[in-house]
């Protein structure tokens, strides 16, 4: 990753030709911070981890990371372009992040409800399992109202700003610390340095904003429970913090943090591993300089890495859901084994379909918003994802 500026990829060529930068895994790179090839440094905000941000769409996307799925976009730091320009890009990126996240919030909440429904069933906050994406949408609107589809979105939007600031603070430090070059040090040392720098930067940023991701998850999964008198568990963002700190202390806000850090490494390893393996095989001949072929490969790799690492996102969010409950998982490994034993391996992928659909919503909104910025303001500013 350190030498990508010296050796432009097909993604970068395509981005230069069409001035298009995307950000696919919001929860996956947000979730899983890091830097992706140029065209994916602006993820089509769909989530954790992201994104994957991949937020980072930020390919930072936080995709994401995703995001994530979860996955934020890196714009140039103040010393590189001047504080005024940096502040403008930072604020406009925040507006773009708010627009894209808010537009994709309904499918994001449905994804989280389906993903964590078994924890809600055990806690008595869900009467029966969801039968699919459409049925979940219908039940949520019928039982809680149309506006409830945006529950938890405020915390998700707020998370963008500290994540961006922290990325600026950490990215250059870790880039210098693991400054391996592919042509100088060899592929494997470069690859290991890439994972180490991305993982360290992502984990460092995640440490400061994880509680917001936790609060977003709890609010999105806080449905009106008929068995509990139709009352919600939390009255808002501040109430999540107050009740969690009272019942579980600081540890309650960080449940699932360790496996989230592992997820950053796994996602980045899968992403760059597949990219380096498939690019020289598939992008040959006339396809080498084709924007659509490059974009298609990037979309395939981003979703492939996000899907392969999705069980980690499920485990971490299922662990989040046990804060304040009488029975908790002893560790991420215990959570993984219990989920597989009691619910089957398929349960680890619940909500994955909605996670992929979120990319479509994010892509359309970001593309339209970019066009609006050009028409109204005369230029396109940085935008955020995860």
Curated annotation (Swiss-Prot):
UniProt keyword Nucleus, yes or no: no
Residues that coordinate or bind ADP: 159, 171, 316
Short sequence motif Nucleotide carrier signature motif: positions: 316-321
Reaction(s) catalysed (UniProt annotation): ADP(in) + ATP(out) = ADP(out) + ATP(in)
Location of the transit peptide in the chain: 1-77
Protein role: ADP:ATP antiporter that mediates import of ADP into the mitochondrial matrix for ATP synthesis, and export of ATP out to fuel the cell. Cycles between the cytoplasmic-open state (c-state) and the matrix-open state (m-state): operates by the alternating access mechanism with a single substrate-binding site intermittently exposed to either the cytosolic (c-state) or matrix (m-state) side of the inner mitochondrial membrane.
Protein name, UniProt field: ADP,ATP carrier protein, mitochondrial
Organism in which the protein naturally occurs: Solanum tuberosum
Gene name of the encoded protein: ANT
């Amino acid at each position: 990753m350190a030498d990508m500026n010296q050796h432009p990829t097909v993604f970068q060529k395509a981005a230069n030709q069409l001035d298009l930068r995307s950000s696919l895994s919001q929860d996956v790179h947000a979730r899983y911070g890091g830097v992706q090839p140029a065209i994916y440094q602006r993820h089509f905000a769909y989530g954790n981890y992201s994104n994957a941000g991949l937020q980072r769409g930020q390919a930072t996307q936080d995709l994401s990371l995703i995001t994530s799925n979860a996955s934020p976009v890196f714009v140039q730091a103040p010393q590189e372009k001047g504080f005024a320009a940096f502040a403008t890009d930072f604020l406009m990126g925040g507006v773009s992040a708010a627009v894209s996240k808010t537009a994709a919030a309904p499918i994001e909440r449905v994804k989280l409800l389906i993903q964590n429904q078994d924890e809600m069933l055990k806690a008595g906050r869900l009467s029966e399992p969801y039968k699919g994406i459409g049925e979940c949408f219908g039940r949520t609107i019928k039982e809680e109202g149309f506006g409830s589809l945006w529950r938890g979105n405020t915390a998700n939007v707020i998370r963008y700003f500290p994540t961006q600031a922290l990325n600026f603070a950490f990215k250059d430090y870790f880039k210098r610390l693991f400054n391996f070059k592919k042509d100088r040090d060899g592929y494997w040392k470069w690859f290991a340095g890439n994972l180490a720098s991305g993982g360290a930067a992502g984990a460092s940023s995640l440490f400061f904003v994880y509680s917001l991701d936790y609060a977003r998850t709890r609010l999105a999964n806080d449905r009106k429970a008929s068995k509990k008198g139709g009352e919600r568990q939390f009255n808002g963002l501040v109430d999540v913090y107050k009740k969690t700190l009272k019942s579980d202390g600081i540890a309650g806000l960080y449940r699932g943090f360790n496996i989230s850090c592992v997820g950053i490494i796994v996602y980045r390893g899968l992403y760059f591993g597949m990219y380096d393996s498939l690019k020289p095989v598939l992008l040959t001949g006339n396809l080498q300089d084709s924007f659509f072929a490059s974009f298609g490969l990037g979309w395939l790799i981003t979703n492939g890495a996000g899907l392969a690492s999705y069980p980690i996102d499920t485990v971490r969010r299922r662990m989040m859901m046990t804060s304040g409950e009488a029975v908790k998982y002893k560790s991420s490994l215990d959570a993984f084994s219990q989920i597989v034993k009691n619910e089957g391996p398929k349960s680890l992928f619940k909500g994955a379909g909605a996670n992929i659909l979120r990319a479509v919503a994010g892509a359309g909104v970001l593309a339209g918003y970019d066009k609006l910025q050009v028409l109204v303001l005369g230029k396109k500013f940085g935008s955020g994802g995860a």
